[in-house]
Regions:
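A short amphipathic helical element positioned immediately N-terminal to and/or at the very start
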Residues: 2-14, 84-89
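Short strand-coil-strand connectors
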Residues: 109-113, 178-180
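Mid-to-C-terminal secondary-structure elements
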Residues: 122, 127-141, 152-207
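Membrane-proximal extracellular/periplasmic loop immediately following the first transmembrane helix
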Residues: 37-107
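Short, strongly hydrophobic transmembrane alpha-helices
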Residues: 16-45
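Solvent-exposed, non-transmembrane alpha-helical starts
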Residues: 71-82, 115-120, 148-152, 191-203
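Short, solvent-exposed loop/turn elements at beta->coil junctions and helix N-caps
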Residues: 104-110, 141-144
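Generic structural signal for small/hydrophobic residues in well-ordered secondary structure
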Residues: 13-16, 23, 44, 60, ...
Length: 207
């Protein structure tokens, strides 16, 4: 019986080739679009390293200042200063961990070699490593003591370490950024650019 169905289907395809091609292409395109939408939803909602605890995250993206006067409509929105983060968020007791960060692009160089390629830099604190579970391939993150002391330490992704030193083994080596010499303390696996909160190529203390 199934062979008969297959023969009939093949015969119909041969009789109406153009219509069959359009129908099959349309069905395949619709299925592909559904799969893409499901994939995008999973990427944005499912937790995986370095955002394994994504379902427990709470984000505060900026601040808003508005007038207290009755009927006042004056408002000002923007990012947060480090003082706001320290006074309003570091003092919280309920969260297991709190972290502040900002991102920028900047070129990196070696002490004896000027380079011009720019990388995505994440200026953050020691709390970042408690929230995001980056898989380290060498070394480890900068500590709270390093952050408080303003010691110029740096964590690189594998790709950046390879670009700069030709190998992923970079702990203890020095990198120059904006005329400041940083010491590499750790190397992590590359972070997919689809992870908006944890994506970066270089991590340094914003202190």
């Amino acid at each position: 019986m199934y062979k008969q169905y297959i023969k009939q289907a093949v015969q119909m395809l041969r009789e109406n080739t153009l219509v069959s091609i359009i129908s099959i292409s349309g069905t395949a395109l619709a299925i592909a679009m559904v799969l893409v939408m499901v994939l995008v939803f999973q990427i944005k909602s499912t937790g995986y390293a370095p955002e394994s605890n994504r379902s427990r995250f709470m984000y505060v993206w900026g601040t808003e200042v508005s007038s207290k006067s009755p009927g006042g409509s004056d408002r000002n929105r923007g990012g947060m200063s480090s003082e706001v983060v320290k006074e309003c968020f570091y003092t919280l007791r309920k969260p297991e961990a709190v972290s502040g960060y900002c991102s920028d692009s900047h070129s990196l160089s070696l002490p004896n070699r000027r380079l011009f390629k720019e990388y995505e830099i994440c200026y953050t604190d020691a709390g970042h490593w408690k929230i995001f579970d980056h898989p380290f391939v060498e070394g480890g993150p900068f500590s709270e003591a390093d952050f408080q002391s303003g010691i110029p330490k740096m964590v690189l992704s594998e790709q950046v370490a390879t670009d700069l030193f030709g190998t992923g083994q970079a702990v203890g080596r020095q990198v120059v950024m904006d005329f400041i010499t940083f010491t590499v303390c750790g190397v992590v696996r590359d972070v997919p650019s689809s992870l908006m909160s944890s994506y970066a190529q270089v991590w340094i203390p914003y202190s």
